[in-house]
């Protein structure tokens, strides 16, 4: 995977199969994107696809981890930041400011990508505010087609789903109780 990509030489041809699975809902009127750490990378394309309709709440340990704000700013309405050390934006986690944003904003969807503990917290807060929430799960995937079952997860209804085929985006209530 990553090691093979790092050894590629400019001009080399790479075969890619995709996109696979399901993405975030692009029909939302005013979504709030919540990303933490490296989880900000996968939702950047979603922000671009939403053509200024989305706001973003990003969290990181320090201001240095939130270089993403420069990439998101031209694509989104508002950019809100939280850092563990308070070096940029509000000191704390994304869930520190999320309740206030959901109370004041006119959001019809929350999309989250980042550490699982963050996404669980975001899903809980969104549920408390009766706002639909989707999360993007990360699992090691062997085949990407659903055949090998290496990315299988248990849902809240007891069903088994494959992150590669049925996800990686799920309704939060489907994967977090």
Residue ranges of predicted features:
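Residues at secondary-structure transition points
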Residues: 2-5, 23-25, 41, 85, ...
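Short beta-strand segments
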Residues: 17, 34-35, 57-59, 113, ...
């Amino acid at each position: 995977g990553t090691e093979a990509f790092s050894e590629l030489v400019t001009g080399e041809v790479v075969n890619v199969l995709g996109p696979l699975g399901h993405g975030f809902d692009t029909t939302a009127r005013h979504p709030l994107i919540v990303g933490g750490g490296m989880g900000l990378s996968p939702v950047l394309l979603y922000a671009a696809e939403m053509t200024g309709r989305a706001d973003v709440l990003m969290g990181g340990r320090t201001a240095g981890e939130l270089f993403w704000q420069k990439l998101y700013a031209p694509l989104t309405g508002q950019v809100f930041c939280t850092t563990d050390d308070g070096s940029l934006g509000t000191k704390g986690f994304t869930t520190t400011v999320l309740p206030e944003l959901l109370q004041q904003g006119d959001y019809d969807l929350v999309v989250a990508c980042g550490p699982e503990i963050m996404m669980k917290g975001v899903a809980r807060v969104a549920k408390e505010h009766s706002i639909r929430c989707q999360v993007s799960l990360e699992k090691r995937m062997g085949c990407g087609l659903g055949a090998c079952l290496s990315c299988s997860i248990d849902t809240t209804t007891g069903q088994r789903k494959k992150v590669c085929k049925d996800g990686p985006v799920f309704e939060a209530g489907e994967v977090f109780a």
